[in-house]
Amino acid sequence: MKSKDWLNRQKRDHFVKKAKKKGYLSRAAFKLVEIENKYKVIEKSKYVLEFGASPGGWSQVVLEVNPRIKITALDVLDFKLNHPNVFFHKEDYLNFNYDKLKKNFDLIL
């Protein structure tokens, strides 16, 4: 998709407008909201590992559902969410040293 086409789609997209209204960093947040409403995977978790975490929309949802949860987020792109419970690593998940985490995760996104 060309940049111009993508921008035009973004302007018309219902979920883009809804995300801005709710303060979400991305429209993808609503996908995780639907998953959580159906399966309740976030509220039971303590530690989350999130791949492809940029810009931070899913992390926002995770923290809304469970404010005490700890999130380890990985992405090669910039992460826009600043929160004390989110530990962001700007790295490729294929090259990341997982041994340094020293914890088990309840949920992987």
Map each language-model feature to its residues.
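Active-site catalytic pocket residues across diverse enzymes, especially alpha/beta-hydrolases
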Residues: 39, 66, 97
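Conserved SAM-binding motif I beta-strand of class I
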Residues: 63, 70-75
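Residues at the starts of beta-strands that form the adenosine-phosphate
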Residues: 47, 68-70
